[in-house]
Every structure is written in structure tokens, then in C-alpha cells.
């Protein structure tokens, strides 16, 4: 869509062949994918990722630079600018203190292209971020990758995330694909006396204090912690599918959590940030096609939830294009599940309501964050004295190269036998600041309220009541 718009607009400017109808049609498609507050879906599915920033927000601003006198372009300048400013308000909360972007979605081999929308805001003058915060975000993203081996010994960008990792190649990737990262260098086209270069860098939101935010379009519940600079999202709205569709989970879209400090396990069946069920052969269910139930804040605590029919997938030989969606196949239904993420800072109380479990006789698995064992991250899943008994636990290991390390570990807790209908709960924590004091201090009190280590509390019964599931 945007490739065609930009190329045809260039041809129009140099006397080449182009079609106004093509450009109009492309702009109409672009507008049809708008989902509010600066966010676009990458197609008709619940597909939200970095393309919102480096494509849907950048190209409209480039079009303004290419054809400022075109009546069509002038007519949409204010609208496109407002959308960009709205998006940047959210995007700046998704950058870690080390400059890491949120590790979620396809085409992550484009690396520091994630900085592009921040530069676009300065080019267009449509941003509420100060020049100092803009440069902190953009230069931080660039430095994050350059410090972690993005260039090989020949000085070339390779397919990978930190260093080269060919396993990240997707069906549309080529040897030159990593050079889409060039968008992240857009700021070099701004003059040396532009405020973005002369201003003193200012702290990112996560460097100034703990952050809480809900981003409605993708259904992301954001918690950033100043103690370790990590931004986490709990995901109840994005799966690169639509409600009711039963396909395999896409590792980069359908997990319950993503962060700036972890890279998802790339296996479709995984305990990575999962609420899943294991059959007699150990196969795990998927959640794609879930229904978003809502989000609210109460006394400094965030709550988001979704429900779904857990399902096993026998993947078709040709499970579909490798553009982010989970693989298609034959689905076998399992239990009905409601999952609520009750979060404050690094700590999540994960509530799980299970129904119709008897038809599957499967074991429950509540999985935590995928942490590289050499990265200094603490990832834990801990039991709490509430709800059904969780009498089994372990850590899933992948002793093989990974986009950000060599040894991946994912803790989990669950049931040793077949799960029964009922309510279950566990504390799920990802921390980069050493001992898990926050997790150890989080517990249920005698009054039935769950208390976080800093004293914030929430009544779990009210969580279910406010979500009001049928």
C-alpha cells in the first residue's frame, strides 16, 4: 500500500507514469485500518506491532515532505499529524531505559527502525514529546543495537536481533531486509541547529519513575519499573487473528506478556507467558482467537482480562504465510478459560478461571517470562494461598542459540493431574533489579484482598465482578 503510494507519488514528481486512482485507493485503505489514538492494525486482524510506527506513521509524514502542495496531501496534514502525536504519547512508554524497544511483532530484524516515528514527529512538528525526550528515545534505540553486535565483522547489518540469527528470517526477508533499519537514521536529515540536536537529552518515562498505561487498540497493559528500567506489557488484545479464530499461537503476537528485556520463545507451543493445558502427550494448547474482556485501574493496580477456548492444533502441512499469523490446522477444543492480569510494577497476579475441564482431562500450566540465564534477569512463577491447588512446577529450558542469548529458561507452575473446574492464581514476576523482594512480599491477606509488597491491595472478587463475564 504505502510502497505503491510513495513510489507513484515520486513518479508523479519526475514526470513518470502514475495513477491518481492508485494513490487515492491506497490512502483509503490506510484510513480504513485506523483503530484510534494513533494506532493502526496491519490488516483486518488484530495485528499490532512496530509497523504502526515505522510504516503507518512515518510514510504519511514523508508524503507531506514529497508533495506539500498536493491538495489531497494538504487536506490530510492535520489529521495525520494528530494521529502521529497520539501514537508517540504511547510509543515513548514502550522504550526501556537501556534503549530497547518492545520485543514484539514481526520484522524485528529491522532493529533500530523502531526509532523512525520519533524522528518523524520532529520533522513534521507533530509531537508532544520535547526534543530532549525525542533524542533520548531515538538515540537510545540506536545505541542499544550497536552495543549488542548488530553489525558483523564486515560492518554489515545481518538477519538477527542483537547479532546474526538466521532463524529470525521470515518468508519475505532477504539479505538486504535488515537495512530497513535506515529509517532509524532519519534524524540525520534534520539540520545541526534543530532543537532535537541542541537540546539536552531528557529521561524517558521509565527513567523518571514507575509507569502505568493502558493502550486500548492493541489491548496492552503497560508497566514500567524505574528500578531496572524494564517495560512490560500484558497482552489481552493482540494475536494477529480475530476473535473466535482457532489457529496456533504466533510467538511474536499471542503471548500474554512481552517486554523490553526478554525475547519470546519462538516455538508455537510454549509455556512462555502462557495459560495452557498439557494433554497426555505433553502437547500444549493455544489461546489465539480470545475475547478481550476489558481493563480498569483500581487503587494503583491495573487489571486486564481475556477469555478463550483453549485448543490443540494439528498444523496443516501448509499452515499459511509466514507474515505473523499463527499456523492453521485442525483444532481440538479444550477447557474454557478466563485469564486476568492484576499488575503493579514487576509483579502480576495472574488469575485463571477454568470451566468445562472434564472433557479434556488435561494438566494446567501457568508460564512465566522467558529469561536468558546470562542476562541477570529474575523470572519466577510463585504459588499463592488462594483458589485451586497448584501442585506441580518446573523450569523449561532451551539449551540452544536464541536471538538474544544461548540458554533460555521459562518457569511454570500447574497441576500434577487433570485440572478441575475452578479458580487458580499465581504470582508471575520479571525483575532486572536483583532479589525478588516484590514477589516475596506479595500475598493474600486474611481479608481476602491481595496485597502487593508496597502495600497496594485489590479485592479479587471485585476483579471478577467488574469484568462481569457471562
Predicted regions located by residue number:
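Aromatic-lined, polymer-binding surfaces characteristic
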Residues: 1-88, 92-119
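Residue-level marker of positions within ordered structural domains that often coincide
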Residues: 13, 35, 64, 123, ...
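Glycine-centered flexibility motif
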Residues: 15, 38-39, 99, 143, ...
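Carbohydrate-active enzyme catalytic cores, enriched for enzymes
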Residues: 96-243
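Extended repeat-based interaction scaffolds and adjacent low-complexity, acidic/S/T/P-biased segments
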Residues: 267-470
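Low-complexity, glycine/alanine/valine/leucine- and proline-rich hydrophobic stretches
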Residues: 206, 210-296
Amino acid at each position: 500500500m504505502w510502497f505503491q503510494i510513495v513510489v507513484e507519488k515520486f513518479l508523479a514528481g519526475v514526470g513518470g507514469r502514475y495513477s491518481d486512482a492508485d494513490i487515492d485507493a491506497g490512502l483509503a485503505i490506510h484510513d480504513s485500518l485506523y483503530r484510534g489514538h494513533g494506532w493502526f492494525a496491519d490488516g483486518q486482524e488484530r495485528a499490532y506491532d512496530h509497523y504502526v510506527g515505522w510504516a503507518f506513521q512515518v510514510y504519511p509524514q514523508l508524503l507531506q515532505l514529497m508533495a506539500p502542495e498536493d491538495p489531497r496531501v494538504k487536506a490530510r496534514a492535520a489529521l495525520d499529524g494528530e494521529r502521529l502525536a497520539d501514537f508517540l504519547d504511547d510509543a515513548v512508554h514502550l522504550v526501556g531505559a537501556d534503549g530497547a524497544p518492545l520485543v514484539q511483532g514481526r520484522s524485528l530484524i529491522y532493529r533500530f527502525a523502531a526509532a523512525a516515528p520519533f524522528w518523524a514527529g520532529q520533522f513534521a512538528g507533530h509531537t508532544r514529546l520535547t526534543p530532549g525526550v525525542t533524542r533520548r528515545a531515538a538515540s537510545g534505540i540506536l545505541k542499544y543495537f550497536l552495543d549488542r553486535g548488530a553489525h558483523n565483522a564486515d560492518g554489515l547489518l545481518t538477519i538477527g536481533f542483537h547479532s546474526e540469527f538466521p532463524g529470525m528470517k521470515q518468508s519475505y526477508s532477504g539479505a538486504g531486509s535488515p537495512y530497513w533499519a535506515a529509517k532509524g537514521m532519519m534524524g540525520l536529515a534534520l539540520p545541526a541547529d534543530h532543537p532535537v540536536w541542541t537540546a539536552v537529552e531528557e529521561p524517558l518515562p521509565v527513567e523518571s519513575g514507575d509507569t502505568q498505561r493502558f493502550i486500548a487498540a492493541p489491548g496492552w497493559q503497560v508497566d514500567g519499573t524505574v528500578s531496572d528500567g524494564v517495560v512490560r506489557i500484558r497482552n489481552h488484545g493482540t494475536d494477529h487473528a480475530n476473535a473466535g479464530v482457532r489457529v496456533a499461537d504466533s510467538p511474536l503476537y499471542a503471548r500474554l506478556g512481552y517486554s523490553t528485556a526478554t525475547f519470546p520463545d519462538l516455538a508455537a507451543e510454549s509455556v512462555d507467558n502462557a495459560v495452557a493445558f498439557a494433554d497426555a502427550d505433553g502437547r500444549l494448547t493455544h489461546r489465539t482467537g480470545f475475547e478481550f474482556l476489558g481493563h480498569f485501574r483500581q487503587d494503583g493496580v491495573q487489571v486486564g482480562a481475556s477469555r478463550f477456548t483453549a485448543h490443540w492444533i494439528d498444523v496443516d502441512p501448509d499452515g499459511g504465510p509466514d507474515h505473523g499469523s499463527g499456523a492453521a490446522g485442525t483444532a481440538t477444543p479444550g477447557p474454557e478459560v478466563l485469564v486476568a492480569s492484576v499488575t503493579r510494577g514487576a509483579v502480576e497476579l495472574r488469575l485463571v478461571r477454568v470451566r468445562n475441564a472434564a472433557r479434556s482431562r488435561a494438566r494446567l500450566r501457568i508460564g512465566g517470562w522467558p529469561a536468558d540465564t546470562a542476562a541477570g534477569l529474575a523470572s519466577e512463577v510463585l504459588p499463592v494461598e488462594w483458589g485451586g491447588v497448584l501442585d506441580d512446577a518446573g523450569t523449561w529450558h532451551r539449551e540452544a542459540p536464541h536471538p538474544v542469548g544461548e540458554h533460555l529458561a521459562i518457569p511454570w507452575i500447574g497441576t500434577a493431574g487433570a485440572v478441575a473446574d475452578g479458580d487458580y492464581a499465581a504470582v508471575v514476576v520479571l525483575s532486572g533489579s536483583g532479589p525478588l523482594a516484590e514477589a516475596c512480599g506479595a500475598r493474600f491477606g486474611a481479608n481476602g484482598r491481595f496485597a502487593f509488597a508496597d502495600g497496594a491491595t485489590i479485592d479479587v472478587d471485585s476483579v471478577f465482578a467488574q469484568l462481569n463475564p457471562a
